[in-house]
Curated annotation (Swiss-Prot):
Cofactor(s) needed: Mg(2+)
Protein name (record): DNA topoisomerase 1
CDD domains per the UniProt record, alphabetical: TOP1Ac, TOPRIM_TopoIA_TopoIII
PANTHER family the record matches: DNA TOPOISOMERASE 1, PROKARYOTIC DNA TOPOISOMERASE
Native organism: Pyrococcus abyssi (strain GE5 / Orsay)
NCBIfam families linked: PRK05776.1 (NF004438), topA_arch (TIGR01057)
Length: 685
C-alpha cells in the first residue's frame, strides 16, 4: 500500500477522485477523512495534513533572550488555537503504519515541501528520503494523472531545506526581537506590553516610515500653469502651455499678457500610431496589483481567493513569480471549454478559428510553477462566491487576451503658436481593439477625439487663464504598491508578502485600507530601532539572507551554514540591544505606556533572601549568553553562591528559608502559586 499525503482535506479529495479507477472509498479515523483508491493494481490511501502540522518552539520553557535552542513540535503546542491539527497528526501516524511506500502531494513550493517533510519525519516516523513526489500546478484530473505517471523519485530537498531555514530564521528574528522589545519596555516601565518585529516585517515598516517622513517634511511650493481655451466646430478645447510648471508669478503674468496680444494658429500636427501588445500572463504580484486596482482587494484577499480557485480546480497554482505558460499546456482544449461560458464565447470562437495559438509571455520565470491560468474546468451555478467570480473573470479574460492581436492606439498632438509661446492640445483613441475587446474592462485608456485641424489654421481663442497650484507631497503607498516595493527590494517571498502587510496592520503599526499611514507607534518603533540597533531593520541584511536561502534551494549552501551565520549575526545585534535595553525601553514606553519618567534609572533587582554563605543579598540575575535567569549573590565574584530557578512566572519572596538556609520563593504562573525551596536537593522538589 501507498500513503499519499496532500496539504489540505479538499485537495486530498480531488487527488483521490483523479487517481481512482473506480469510485474512491471515503473513510474516517479520529474524525479525519481519508480515501482508499486503486490505481495501476496498487492500493492507495490518500490522506492530508491541514496546512502546517508542526512548528518551531524552544526546547526549554523560559522567556529570556536570545534563544536559539529550538525544535519542531506539533503545531497545537507551538501555537494557540491549533488543536484541530491533533487528530490529523494522529491519523497520519496510524495510517503510516499500514503502508510501505509514501508519496508527498502537497503544494509544490517551499512551504508545501516543509509540510510534507515534517509530516513524514514526525507524524509518520519515516525518513523523508523514502518518499516520492507528485508535482503539479493545477488540480485537474489530467494534471494529477500526469503527476502520478511522472513521479519525482524524492521530495525536493533543496526546497525543503530552504523552507526549513526560512522558518528557523523567521523564528530567531521574530521571537528574539519581539522578546527584546517587550523586555525593554518592562524594564523601563514595569509593565508587560508586547511589541513585535521580524526579519521582513521591520524593513517593510522602515520604508513605509521613510515615505511618511517625506510627507511630513514636505513643504509645498507654489507654481502656475497656463491654459489656452479655444473653440473648434462649437467644441471647447483646453491646450496646455509647453512648460508644465512656471515657478514665477511674474513670468506667468507676462506670458498671459503676451498671448492675449497675439493671434493663435496651428503650427504643427503630430499623429502617431502605436501597437499595444497584450499584457503578459499573471504572476501573483501582478494579479494582486490588478485586483486591487479593479476591485479594491487587499493583496491578502487576492491570494486567499486565488488559492480557493486553485483548490476548487478552476485556476492554476497562485504562488508563482512566473510570467510564462507551460509548453505542453493544451491551449485549444482550455479555450474550447471556456467557450461554453456565454460571456467568453465570442472571444473564444475567434481564437479557435486561428491556425496557431501562441501566447504573449513575460520575462520572469519560476522553477516551481508556471504563470496563473484557467484550467478549463468550468464553474457551475453556486460554485463561486461573488468575489471569486470577479477574480476568475479577470484571470480568464487575461488568458484569452494573451492570444489576441495587438491593439492599435492613435495619439494626436496639435501645437498652437500664440506669439512666441506654444500650447499643446492632445488627443488619443483606440483605432483597433485587438485584445482590448476581451480585457479592456480592466485597462483604463483615455479616449479623447480631437476635431480635424490643419497646419497654419487660425484658432479662435476664448480665454487665456493663469492658475495657481502647489506641489504635492509623494503619495502614500497603497497595499498593492507595498507588495511591489517589497518585490523590488527583494524582501519577503511571493507567498509571505501579503501576510507581512497584514501583520503590520494587526500590530497597530499602520492604518488605512487604500492609503497606508504609519501610526505614531509604528513611527516610534522604527525611530528607536534606527537610533540604537539599525541592523534590526536593515533591508540589505534581509535581502542577503533571502539570497542565501535561494542558494540553499540550488544546493550551493547548506541550511546549517545559513542558520549558523544568522545565529552569529543576531547574537551580535542582541548584544548591542541589551547594552541599550533601558534606553530603548524608555523611548518605546513613553508611547505605549505613557507615564514613564524621563530620567534613566537602573531596574531594582528582585531580592529573594540573604546569602547563607556571606550574608549578601540573593538576587535574580540573567545569564548574558543564554538569557536564562538564576539567583545569585550580590557579592559576586567574591561569593559564588547561585541557585537555578524556573524560567517562567513571577518570583515572589516569602522571607522563609529551607535547606541549608536556601530561600523559599513563590512562583506565580497563569494564576497558580507554587512554593519552592531554591535548593534543588530539597526533598520538596
Amino acid at each position: 500500500m501507498i500513503l499519499v499525503i496532500a496539504e489540505k482535506p479538499n485537495v486530498a479529495r480531488k487527488i483521490a477522485g483523479a487517481l481512482s479507477e473506480r469510485r474512491p472509498i471515503r473513510k474516517t479515523i479520529f474524525g479525519v477523512p481519508y480515501y482508499e483508491v486503486f490505481r495501476d493494481g496498487k492500493k492507495l490511501i490518500v490522506a492530508s495534513a491541514v496546512g502546517h502540522l508542526y512548528g518551531l518552539a524552544p526546547k526549554q520553557d523560559f522567556f529570556g533572550y536570545p534563544i536559539f535552542d529550538i525544535e519542531w513540535v506539533p503545531v497545537y503546542i507551538a501555537e494557540k488555537n491549533k488543536d484541530y491539527a491533533k487528530d490529523y497528526i494522529k491519523a497520519l501516524s496510524v495510517l503510516a503504519k499500514r503502508v510501505k511506500e509514501f508519496i508527498v502531494a502537497c503544494d509544490y513550493d517551499t512551504e508545501g515541501e516543509v509540510i510534507g517533510y515534517t509530516a513524514l519525519k514526525y507524524a509518520c516516523g519515516v525518513d523523508p528520503s523514502r518518499a516520492k513526489r507528485m508535482k503539479f500546478s493545477a488540480l485537474t484530473k489530467r494534471d494529477l494523472l500526469n503527476a502520478w505517471r511522472n513521479l519525482e523519485p524524492t521530495i525536493n530537498f533543496g526546497m525543503a531545506n530552504a523552507g526549513i531555514a526560512r522558518h528557523v530564521l523567521d523564528w530567531y528574528w521574530g521571537v528574539n526581537l519581539s522578546r527584546a522589545l517587550t523586555h525593554a519596555i518592562k524594564r523601563a516601565s514595569g509593565k508587560w506590553v508586547v511589541l513585535s518585529t521580524g526579519r521582513v516585517q521591520g524593513p517593510t515598516l522602515k520604508f513605509l516610515v521613510e515615505r511618511e517622513r517625506e510627507i511630513q517634511s514636505f513643504v509645498p511650493k507654489p507654481y502656475w500653469v497656463i491654459k489656452l481655451v479655444i473653440e473648434k466646430n462649437g467644441q471647447k478645447l483646453v491646450a496646455n502651455y509647453e512648460k508644465d510648471k512656471i515657478w514665477s508669478e511674474e513670468e506667468a503674468k507676462k506670458i498671459v499678457t503676451e498671448v492675449k496680444k497675439s493671434k493663435a494658429r496651428v503650427s504643427n500636427i503630430e499623429v502617431k500610431r502605436q501597437k499595444r501588445n497584450p499584457p503578459v500572463p499573471f504572476d501573483l504580484g501582478t494579479l494582486q496589483r490588478e485586483a486591487y486596482s479593479a476591485f479594491g482587494f487587499s493583496p491578502k484577499k487576492t491570494l486567499d481567493i486565488a488559492q480557493s480557485l486553485y483548490e476548487k480546480g478552476f485556476t492554476s497554482y497562485p504562488r508563482t513569480e512566473s510570467q510564462k505558460l507551460p509548453k505542453n499546456l493544451n491551449f485549444r482544449l482550455i479555450i474550447q471549454n471556456i467557450s461554453r461560458m456565454p460571456q467568453y464565447r465570442p472571444y473564444a470562437h475567434l481564437l479557435l478559428g486561428m491556425p496557431e495559438l501562441k501566447p504573449v509571455e513575460g520575462k520572469k520565470e519560476d522553477p516551481a510553477h508556471p504563470a496563473i491560468y484557467p484550467t478549463g474546468e468550468i464553474p457551475g451555478p453556486g460554485d463561486l462566491s461573488k468575489d471569486e467570480e470577479k477574480l476568475y473573470d479577470m484571470i480568464v479574460r487575461r488568458f484569452l487576451a494573451l492570444f489576441m492581436e495587438p491593439a492599435v492606439r492613435e495619439s494626436v498632438k496639435v501645437t498652437i503658436l500664440a506669439g512666441p509661446h506654444k500650447f499643446m492640445l492632445s488627443g488619443a483613441r483606440t483605432v483597433k481593439q485587438g485584445w482590448l475587446s476581451v480585457y479592456g474592462k480592466y485597462i483604463k485608456f483615455d479616449e479623447v477625439t480631437l476635431p480635424e485641424f490643419f497646419i497654419g489654421e487660425r484658432v479662435r481663442v476664448l480665454q487665456v487663464r493663469r492658475e495657481k497650484k502647489k506641489t504635492k507631497p509623494p503619495a502614500r503607498y497603497s497595499p498593492a504598491a507595498v507588495i511591489k516595493k517589497m518585490e523590488d527590494l527583494g524582501i519577503g517571498t511571493k507567498a509571505t508578502r501579503a501576510q507581512i502587510l497584514e501583520t503590520l496592520y494587526q500590530r497597530g503599526y499602520i492604518e488605512g485600507k487604500k492609503s497606508i499611514k504609519v501610526t505614531p507607534l509604528g513611527m516610534k518603533v522604527i525611530e528607536t530601532l534606527e537610533k540604537y540597533v539599525p541592523e534590526i531593520i536593515s533591508v540589505e541584511l534581509t535581502r542577503e539572507f533571502e539570497r542565501k536561502m535561494d542558494l540553499i534551494m540550488q544546493g550551493k549552501l547548506t541550511k546549517e551554514e545559513v542558520i549558523e551565520e544568522a545565529k552569529v549575526k543576531l547574537t551580535k545585534i542582541l548584544e548591542e540591544f541589551k547594552k541599550r535595553e533601558l534606553e530603548i525601553g524608555l523611548e518605546l514606553a513613553r508611547i505605549v505606556v505613557g507615564d514613564v519618567k524621563d530620567e534613566i534609572k537602573e531596574e531594582k533587582p528582585i531580592v529573594v533572601g540573604k546569602c547563607p554563605k556571606c550574608g549578601g543579598d540573593l538576587i535574580v540575575k540573567y545569564n548574558k549568553k543564554t538569557g536564562k535567569r538564576f539567583v545569585g549573590c550580590s557579592n559576586w565574584p567574591k561569593c559564588d553562591v547561585t541557585y537555578p530557578i524556573l524560567q517562567r512566572g513571577e518570583i515572589i519572596p516569602t522571607n522563609k528559608t529551607c535547606c541549608n538556609g536556601a530561600p523559599v520563593v513563590i512562583i506565580r504562573d497563569k494564576g497558580r502559586d507554587i512554593e519552592i525551596c531554591l535548593d534543588i536537593k530539597c526533598k520538596k522538589w
